[in-house]
Every structure is written in C-alpha cells, then in structure tokens.
Amino acid sequence: MLFRSMRRVHTLVLVPSIESARKINREMTRRGCNLLSDGRPIVGLTSIQLAELVLSLEPKALIIPAHAWTPWFSLYGSMSGFDSIDEAFGPFAKNIYAVETGLSSSPAMNWRIKELDQRAIVSFSDAHSGPKLGREATVFEMPELSYKGIYSAIKQTPVEVGIPLSRIAYTIEFYPEEGKYHYTGHRACGVRLSPEETRAKGVNCPVCGKPLTVGVMQRVEDLASCSEASLELTTINKQLTTNGTSIQVTGSKAFPHRPPFVMLVPLAEIIAESLGAPVASIKVQTTYSRLIEALGGEFTVLLAAQTREIAKLAGERVAVGIDKVRRGEIVIDPGYDGVFGVVKIWRGEEGKPLLEGSREQLSMF
C-alpha cells in the first residue's frame, strides 16, 4: 500500500534516569539523528536499530510502539506499518512488553490480536497540546510511585495469576469511534466506510477512484485472530482507590486477567453539547473551570463526582450529560481519514428542556 516502504514507527522510550536518557540522546546524535528538529523527531533508524541502541545502553528501558494502529507512523498502520511485532523489531520483539492504543483503537480491539496476548495494552495522550493532556491514561496500582514499579507493572504477562504488588489497574480511553482514523475513508470526497462496507466496495474511493485511507477498525479486522464476540465483553464495577467510589469499567470474560478499561468523552465536549455552545466559548470554559476547581480535576468530574454536586455547579443538563456518558448512552459518527468522530449525547436534541425522565434519573444521585 501507499508508503509501505517507509516503515516509520512512532515509538515511546521510557528509561529509569535522566543519565540514561542523556546517554541514549548522545548516541543517537552521534549517529546523525537530529533530536531538536521536532517534538517527535524522525531519526532515520529502523525499529530494530532503535531497540538495539536503546537496550545496549539501558537494559531496563521500556520500548512501546505509540498509537499502534493509526495509518501513518505506527506499528500496525495500514499505510506504513508492519503486520507483526516480530516483523518490526526482529530479535528485539521479545523486549516489546506493551503497545499503546492511540485514540482510534480500544483495548478490546487490541485483545483480538494473538501476539498481544502476552503483552500489556497501555493508553497515553499527546504531549504537544496542553488542553488534551491526559485525555487517555493508564492507571497504575503500586506501593509507591517508581520507575521500578511502572516497569514491573508493564512487563508482567497479563495471563499471570494472583495480584502483583505493582500492576495496571485499568486504562482510561477515548471512544475509539471519536478518533480521526477509526473508519476507512476519503476526506476530500466525504466517503466513510465501515469494515463491512470496505469489504464490499474495496479500498479505492467510489467517488474519485483514489486510494482510501484504510482505517484502524479495518486494519484490526485484517490482523485479528478472533472476533469481538469471542472476547465476551462485560461490565465490571471497579472501586477507585482514591475515594472508594465505584465506576463501571469494561472487561473480558475470555481474558479475565486483562486490566479493564473505561471510555470517556472529554469534559469540555460534554459541556459544549449540553449548553449548545462551542468548546472554546467563554460559557463552556467558565463552566469547565468551575467544575474542576470545585471537584478536583477532569477525571474526578467524569468518573467519580456525585451527579447532584455537578448539577449544583453546572446545571442539571450538564450533570445528565455526564451521567449519560458514564452509562455509554451516546451516539458517535465515526472518524475517518483525519476527520474526528462526532459525539452526540442527545441525538440532535441540543437546546431542548431537560426531559422529565432525566430529572428522575438525576434525583437518584
């Protein structure tokens, strides 16, 4: 496919000390890598060369392919990726203990890939956009925060029994449909295809004939060794260690030792739809600031805060919107070819008065 020969993989490298990072930076610079060219520099090393360099200098480094499924610059990307970790990292595949989901895939989608059975699924977020920091996250449980604990939690095999001292408790996810490469499509022609439609119509644009950008969902279908149904996804009540509040997370009966995940919509987007105002508007930003300052941060508002407290600060409609997201009662037009998916909480009912049923629902909290 287009750009298959380039094989560029955005890779995270975690090391236990600043000195280790300096040693790696010095060696990469010596090899001609311009690390100052960009926040995510293209260094001209293959995945095998990068792994060899890093692990020779820091054996305890963690090497994690980032946003593993996006079409470009990713491990499994349809436009420039590989079909397996072995193909990408060769003899160092055994040192790849995790992959990162990216916005357009969920842990459940990754659980369908056989070679990931023995690897952790982690989720992080962009480091280049302040308001979007932490929109996806990995929650660890460990006696004390340390690199050793993080390394141990990520390295351990997901099928191991017992409860280790350091482990991944769960991950916090975007709805993958909201990611901008979830479905296959062609932005210029407004063409968006599900995997079923892609199989029926092919990977050329039905309007102009140009190649489509094959989306993450289609790529997962191409490489999967099992169906989504075989995962036996189920809802689990997970108790937060911070305040004892229970949240609903998604786990798998087929893979019971896999850390579960919870899917969220960014708070500003919920407020914006609830108030019928743009995300960047003063009205939305003021409400957002009021909530996080009073209740203790965006994740606390989205996951743990009592709905009645949210209603006091932001109004009943915002509170009901957050509750609907917690319950998964939303509709999303999937993203494709660089276009983000669109979340709808009220299915076109923006601006209407709060329904009586919603008032009753709110009174339960």
Language model: regions and residue ranges:
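Extended hydrophobic/aromatic segments used for targeting, binding, or gating
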Residues: 90-91, 105-109, 330
